[in-house]
Amino acid sequence: MVKVNGFSFVARSAGIRKSGKPDLGLIFSTVPARCAGVFTTNKVQAAPVLVTAPRIAAGECQAVLVNSGNANACTGEVGMQDALRCGQLAAKSLGIDEQLVAVSSTGVIGHPLPMPLLEKTIPGMSEGLSETAVDDVANAMMTTDSFAKVASRQAGDSAPYTILGVAKGAGMIHPNMATMLSFVMTDACVDQHFLQQALRQAVEGSFNIITVDRDTSTNDMVLVLANGESKTPEIVADSAEGQEFAELLRGVLLDLAKMIVRDGEGATKLVHVCVNGAADDGDARKVAYNVATSNLVKTAFFGEDANWGRIIAAVGYSEAQVDPSRIAIFFDGVPVVQKGLGTGPELEAQATDVLKQAEFSVTIDLGLGDGRGEYYTSDLTYEYVKINADYRT
């Protein structure tokens, strides 16, 4: 079990979820931690986002309280007061300033939090804090997720520290984040401004290159807390240590991001869409985005149909610079298109075998330049429709 110096965790069932499963998680640092955050781009933002964003912007955080089963979104002033009250209850239990508590929620939109249940449960949570209970918090965050999502990285021997992250998400997953929460804890000592910079870059190369269903939630947030309890020297920008930290942080977030796509509601495939040879990186990303989000492409993945026509059509409407006569498409290295033309039934049959795998790559070479881009996506299945048709019942 991975531990991070100075961090402890606890989860409880407050009764928000009908199933009776844990629905309330608490992350605590023994000392105030430097922090950074990235939040939903949705213009309709849930109360916990509105409460937490300015607290994170202040630069210090000591605890994160998260509930599942209720988003506390579109709940008006009552929702704001409820979010504030939850933070107050956690702060009092922990003996810290309420401004150091981040609050987060995920679940059904439009219903007020069941405050009597939370008033009863939150005050006693601090008594159960444990250095090894991170999996419990990851489980308490889940809604339609089928498994808990935890990832970690450790720095080298010269100045050792640990980065540990948890996440939830399976539906409403789309670039610029979606119904997706992630909390990252590290005992490294990191300059606060660099921490925000490193987080934004890591999110750009992880959570912002995944898609399940093109929906973006009201509640997304990614937070990182760095408490310095490893007692290693401060990590700053433009240094070898800073580069290592940024790479490790992205590694944790990318692991979590791929778990989210793998757990996409009803998903049976994890597909890595890679675009090479674009005029520039922006064009490459446009192409990867359009292929990864095409419902026709995603249903072909589910049907294990190497239907490259749907892919090349998505390339064509991406608004990227394209010369059809230069396009090549590969499934795990099997060429199905060369110079804009199909390579024939034998290679297409090999590509169909590739699509029977749970994970594979689709590589598109535009043959125009050095631009590169990527996305991770899932297939689109009957089960996705069923899960979301029944979500509130």
Curated annotation (Swiss-Prot):
GO terms, biological process: L-arginine biosynthetic process; ornithine biosynthetic process
Site feature: Cleavage: A178, T179
InterPro entries listed in its UniProt record: Arg_biosynth_ArgJ (IPR002813), ArgJ-like_dom_sf (IPR016117), ArgJ_beta_C (IPR042195)
Any one cellular-component term (Gene Ontology): cytoplasm
EC id: 2.3.1.35, 2.3.1.1
Site label Involved in the stabilization of negative charge on the oxyanion by the formation of the oxyanion hole, positions: T106, G107
SUPFAM superfamilies, A to Z: DmpA/ArgJ-like (SSF56266)
Active site: T179
Any one GO molecular function term: glutamate N-acetyltransferase activity
Residues that bind substrate: T143, K168, T179, E265, N388, T393
The UniProt record lists the keyword Ribonucleoprotein: no
Catalytic reactions of this protein: N(2)-acetyl-L-ornithine + L-glutamate = N-acetyl-L-glutamate + L-ornithine; L-glutamate + acetyl-CoA = N-acetyl-L-glutamate + CoA + H(+)
Keyword Amino-acid biosynthesis found: yes
Protein's pathway: Amino-acid biosynthesis; L-arginine biosynthesis; L-ornithine and N-acetyl-L-glutamate from L-glutamate and N(2)-acetyl-L-ornithine (cyclic): step 1/1; Amino-acid biosynthesis; L-arginine biosynthesis; N(2)-acetyl-L-ornithine from L-glutamate: step 1/4
CDD domains with a match to the protein in the record: OAT
Protein keywords: Acyltransferase, Amino-acid biosynthesis, Arginine biosynthesis, Autocatalytic cleavage, Cytoplasm, Multifunctional enzyme, Transferase
Location of the protein in the cell: Cytoplasm
Function: Catalyzes two activities which are involved in the cyclic version of arginine biosynthesis: the synthesis of N-acetylglutamate from glutamate and acetyl-CoA as the acetyl donor, and of ornithine by transacetylation between N(2)-acetylornithine and glutamate.
PANTHER family in the cross-refs: ARGININE BIOSYNTHESIS BIFUNCTIONAL PROTEIN ARGJ, ARGININE BIOSYNTHESIS BIFUNCTIONAL PROTEIN ARGJ, MITOCHONDRIAL
Assembly and interaction partners: Heterotetramer of two alpha and two beta chains.
Family: Belongs to the ArgJ family.
HAMAP family referenced in this protein's UniProt entry, alphabetically: ArgJ (MF_01106)
Name by which UniProt lists this protein: Arginine biosynthesis bifunctional protein ArgJ
Name of the encoding gene: argJ
